[in-house]
Amino acid sequence: MTDTPDTPDTPMATGASSRPPLRALTPLEGRVVAVLLEKQFTVPDTYPLSLNALAAGCNQKTARSPVMSVGEDEILTAIDGLKSLSLVFEGSSSRVPRFEQNLARVLGVPSQSAALLSTLLLRGPQTAAELRLNTARLHAFADISSVEAFLDELAERDPALVVKLPRGPGEREHRWTHLLCGEVSLAEAPGLRTSASIEIAPSELEALRISHRELEDKVARLQALVEEMAEQLGISIDPDRLS
């Protein structure tokens, strides 16, 4: 086991932590190291993972965002990159190559934080409540506030490992995302586009204009019909009430 020992559900109050710069991971590198950490807790009997099991975890259809479809050659390339960062090791006690992760030790974070980071890598941006639910098999956080405490500590590190995203339209809670694959564009983060940022194609805009003109024509014809019927019935109608 390469993870740091468990600590209580409160980050150590030692101020903002710093670490040597770690290059941004590729999306596949992030997926590989996160799958290894996940499977270490969910299927410990098969950990360290074989290449075949690792590929299955990377291409898993559930609990993954985005869903990937990658081959073993691509995964081996990602493993080589992770080995160069000491984030992944290859075991030597089996005839079949097996791989294990070293995320917590390299980043200098407790196992609770590593669980949060791996879940963000696997599932994308999530609220603290979602993270508490989705990390349950990796670490059972006591409550949402303890999740937020670890997220805040990760955000205060130098460099930061996570960031809190602005609330999008209709969202009640802030979501968090990891920064292990580089900085994120808040304007392009999922669910954060506002109505002002929505682009309408020229053809769609012209169709809206035509529809608007047709609607105006129908209203005008109905108004004329009402006025004609009122005149036939001898009813006086204020034109302003029809506009």
UniProtKB/Swiss-Prot annotation:
SUPFAM superfamilies given in the database record: Winged helix' DNA-binding domain
Biased composition (Low complexity): 1-11
Domain of life: Bacteria
Annotated keywords: Plasmid
Pfam family, one: DUF480
Keyword Transcription: no
Region listing for Disordered, in residue ranges: 1-23
UniProt family annotation: Belongs to the UPF0502 family.
Protein name: UPF0502 protein Rmet_3697
